[in-house]
């Protein structure tokens, strides 16, 4: 469960290292989970990269520390809160994705991110 003011690790090579959630898209919602799109501000970035510090970006959540319950009864939990920076067309701004992602991203039509991921759980 991600809410406003939550810090997330960026799991791609767009240049950002950490972002802070400032808005959850999709109505008047308090919390976001895996596969939800948020608006965040870049708090830490690598120099000489496309994404700079204090840029406002869109991102999709790909890992959360909170347990996710699936319909088949399985529960899954990750070690960190992580997101991938996307553009207006929901395509990733980076060319690589680091770490495992949840299968729920495939159901929410983020197939480009799923194809870049090294492992889908």
From Swiss-Prot:
* Pfam families for this protein: Ribosomal_L14
Please indicate which superkingdom the organism of origin belongs to. Eukaryota
User: Could you tell me which SUPFAM superfamilies the record lists for this protein?
Assistant: Ribosomal protein L14
Xref: InterPro entries: Ribosomal_uL14 (IPR000218), Ribosomal_uL14_bac-type (IPR005745), Ribosomal_uL14_sf (IPR036853)
Q: Which GO terms describe its molecular function?
A: large ribosomal subunit rRNA binding; structural constituent of ribosome
The record's note on quaternary structure and interaction partners says: Part of the 50S ribosomal subunit.
Q: Can you name a GO cellular component term?
A: chloroplast
Its annotated function is as follows: Binds to 23S rRNA.
Q: Where in the cell is it found?
A: Plastid, Chloroplast
This chain belongs to the protein called Large ribosomal subunit protein uL14c
- Biological process GO annotation list? translation
* Family under the similarity heading: Belongs to the universal ribosomal protein uL14 family.
Where does this protein come from, organism-wise? Guillardia theta
User: Which UniProt keyword terms apply here?
Assistant: Chloroplast, Plastid, Ribonucleoprotein, Ribosomal protein, RNA-binding, rRNA-binding
């Amino acid at each position: 469960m991600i809410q406003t003011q939550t810090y997330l690790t960026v799991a791609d090579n767009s240049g950002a290292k950490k972002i802070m959630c400032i808005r959850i898209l999709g109505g008047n919602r308090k919390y976001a989970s895996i596969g939800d799109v948020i608006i965040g501000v870049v708090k830490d970035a690598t120099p000489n990269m496309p994404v700079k510090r204090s840029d406002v970006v869109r991102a999709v959540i790909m890992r959360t520390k909170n347990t996710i319950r699936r319909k088949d009864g399985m529960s899954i939990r990750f070690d960190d809160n992580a997101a991938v920076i996307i553009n207006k067309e929901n395509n990733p701004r980076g060319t690589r994705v680091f770490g495992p992602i949840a299968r729920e991203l495939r159901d929410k039509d983020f197939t480009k991110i799923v194809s870049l991921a090294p492992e889908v759980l």
